[in-house]
Swiss-Prot record:
It comes from Rhodopseudomonas palustris (strain HaA2). PANTHER family: ATP-DEPENDENT DETHIOBIOTIN SYNTHETASE BIOD 2 (PTHR43210:SF2), DETHIOBIOTIN SYNTHETASE (PTHR43210). This is ATP-dependent dethiobiotin synthetase BioD. It holds the Pfam family AAA_26. The gene is bioD. Mg(2+) binds at residues 17, 100.
Amino acid sequence: MTKPIVVTGTDTGIGKTVFAAALAGALDAFYWKPVQAGIEDETDRQAVLRLSGLPDARLLPEAYRLNTPASPHLAAEIDGVTIDAEALALPEIDGPLVVEGAGGLLVPLTRAITYIDIFARWRAPVVLCARTTLGTINHTLLSIEALRARAIPLLGVAFIGDENVESERVIVQIGRVPRLGRLPRLVEVTADALRAAFAQNFNTDDFLKDPAS
């Protein structure tokens, strides 16, 4: 039976893929990125393969691989590809599955459908990755509100970056959401360093609990 966890973020470039790699490795899970936009450099799937310690067979192929590094809706239009967002379904996997979105919740897959629309249909529990720098309180609380408005189950917030006790505390208090932990900035991002940092700062049992309401 598939046990999916959706990893999304408050913004792009905050370390969501690195976190997804750490989580997938810690849970000995499968990993899936439904849409990859931009394949010239290392793709997210390739990064997770490098950092998670998982065998290649655990990393499922993307539903769409787009050449252009842009929002999926625009990348698809430039590449001449039609994304059938309504047909995107969670793979049938026997065991845990980490699914990574792109950027934030309202990143468009098409001109009519955003990632949060897909997450609402899937009803899979979500981990919200948030940075710790200036502006994160507003971005994170808005993302929490958006998830709750669509009745999407939220496991909690995973902070990424340098310690910011006050911002983290305010988000947890006002957002009424569990703090899952904080992945610190790593001097060198390797599989071993990431595995150790995740084990020190997160409890894998927290990702297997029933989501907060």
